[in-house]
Design a protein with these regions (language model features):
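Hydrophobic faces of well-ordered beta-strands that scaffold small-molecule active sites
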Residues: 3-7, 31-33, 64-69, 104-106, ...
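Alpha-helix N-cap and loop-to-helix initiation/capping positions
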Residues: 44-52, 80-88, 114-125, 148, ...
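C-terminal/domain-terminus segments
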Residues: 253-278
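N-terminal pre-domain/capping segments
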Residues: 1-101, 135, 190, 246, ...
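Active-site beta-loop-alpha junctions enriched in small/polar residues
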Residues: 6-10, 34-36, 69-72, 109-111, ...
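A short, acidic, amphipathic alpha-helical segment used as a generic capping/interface helix at domain edges
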Residues: 236-250
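Acidic/histidine-rich catalytic cores of soluble enzymes
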Residues: 67, 125-238, 280
């Protein structure tokens, strides 16, 4: 396995080039970069900029573990929004190819547990289209775990026509659904193509759809997500990392463990803590 870090974890708004340099200085193997908007989006990068970033990454000995193609909102739940979202996803897949990245990660919205729900077909049609294109380019579109349990996600992926996999975030399971990440790895194993290293605790159980609707639109007035879960430094929350890493190894996973730290007073210190914790377990 290899260890990576999301560039935005060094500070939202920090130039991507600076974050790449920080990642190299801390001894990471690769970086995951947000590519939907901002300076690393398809709209922002011309051929010369792509060449410049490739040269920087090569000079620092870094790979691009994945691009993040998350577009926010309700993901692929709204049919009339999907043509534009599919087009953007395909452009991000093309951008991933420019950097030799084999994975594009994204949140897709809340997958209904009932396959007869009309939203299920809307999402399936969109992800099938995205998956076909990604597969044609040698890339996997990796759905980030979050609002649904592993069995629902597994069934959904099985219903696509390839090119769709999993970006497994263990903290999202423990914080939102309450599912043990180890059991999720055992079920999703063959579909896992990228992972996040993140820890957290659930403070109060609720319907995950309520949480993700809040993320998408601002949700229910006065809803405070901090009442329901909390992201914490790796090793201090409810993710059993020794068991989780062991499960990944047993499943044959040999890809990236990419650190994601979205909060905290000193994110870089937490990034180093996560790196050191994972190194002891993965190697």
């Amino acid at each position: 396995m290899k260890i990576g870090v999301i560039t935005d974890c060094f500070g939202f708004g920090l130039p991507v080039a600076t974050a790449i340099e920080r990642a190299a200085a801390l001894g990471f193997d690769g970086v995951q970069i947000y590519a939907t908007t901002g300076s690393f989006s398809p709209d922002a990068l011309d051929a010369e900029a792509i060449k410049s970033y490739r040269e920087l990454l090569n000079s620092k000995g870094l790979e691009v573990s994945a691009l993040c193609g998350d577009m926010g909102g309700h993901g692929f739940q709204i049919a009339e929004d999907n043509p534009a979202r599919i087009e953007m996803t395909n452009r991000i897949v093309d951008l991933a190819c420019e950097f030799g990245a084999k994975v594009v990660t994204t949140h897709i919205g809340v997958i209904p547990s009932d396959k007869n729900d009309p939203t299920y077909k809307v999402m399936l049609d969109a992800l099938t289209a995205c998956g076909k294109y990604a597969k044609s380019r040698g890339v996997t579109l990796a759905i980030e775990t979050g609002p649904e349990t592993a069995d629902v996600l597994y069934g959904f992926i099985q219903d696509t026509e390839g090119g769709v996999g999993v970006n497994l975030d263990p903290a999202n399971f423990v914080m939102v659904t309450g599912q043990d990440p180890v059991s999720a790895v055992k079920l999703l194993g063959k579909h896992i193509v990228h992972t996040h290293v993140k820890d957290g605790v659930m403070l109060k159980r609720t319907d995950p759809k309520i949480i993700y609707d809040h993320f998408a639109t601002g949700g229910i007035e006065a809803l405070n997500v901090a009442d329901f879960f909390k992201e914490v430094p790796v090793g201090t929350g409810d993710v059993d990392f020794p068991a989780y890493i062991a499960a990944l190894k047993e499943a044959g996973y040999d890809g990236y463990l990419t650190i994601e730290r979205e909060t905290g007073a000193d994110p870089e210190a937490d990034i180093v803590l996560a790196r050191d914790t994972i190194k002891k377990l993965a190697f």
